[in-house]
């Protein structure tokens, strides 16, 4: 296994930093940071996207019967399968639970109605957006990985650190 960069931080601070940066990258699609941090963030982001790709199709349809006004009605509910549930729990443990922000000129009630159904927006984005998109690319190209790219930028003015932008493709 490849050695991990220490990034000049204690272990707990380094892990928290990487967890925050990977979460922000996956949520926003783009992150500006130092080149060394970008390389570490890229490793983790690729790993988490691969976990989502390998399990996003695992669903189970269950029929539930509810009695409403004396009449029995059956409802089909789509649940996560065992593999997808394990992947979802792993991602929830590894990423921060970012919430959707209120849009401009959106009232509090509109915001609550819009976000009511989604409890973990970042995890849903991983399974509903990134996984199908990259799975289609993988099946079309026959190549796994390469979900992110690092673009080097100029040095930071204050300390001369090499900066980079990491992007989810």
Question: Which stretches of residues belong to each language-model region?
Answer:
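Structured, basic alpha/beta domains of bacterial-type, RNA-associated proteins
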Residues: 2-6, 21-25, 31-35, 39-169
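Basic, ligand-binding patches in group-transfer machinery
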Residues: 17
């Amino acid at each position: 296994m490849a050695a991990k960069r220490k990034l000049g931080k204690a272990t707990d601070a380094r892990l928290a930093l990487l967890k925050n940066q990977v979460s922000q990258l996956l949520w926003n699609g783009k992150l500006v940071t130092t080149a060394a941090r970008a390389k570490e963030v890229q490793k983790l982001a690729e790993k988490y996207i691969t976990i989502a790709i390998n399990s996003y199709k695992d669903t189970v349809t269950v029929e539930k019967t509810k009695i409403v006004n004396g009449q029995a009605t059956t409802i089909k509910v789509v649940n996560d399968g065992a593999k997808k549930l394990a992947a979802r729990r792993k991602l929830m443990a590894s990423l921060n639970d970012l919430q959707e922000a209120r849009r401009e000129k959106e009232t509090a009630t509109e915001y609550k109605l819009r976000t009511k159904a989604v409890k973990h927006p970042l995890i849903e984005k991983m399974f509903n957006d990134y996984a199908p998109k990259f799975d289609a690319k993988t099946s079309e190209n026959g190549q796994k990985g390469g979900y992110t790219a690092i673009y080097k930028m100029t040095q930071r003015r204050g300390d001369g650190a090499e900066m980079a932008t990491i992007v989810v493709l």
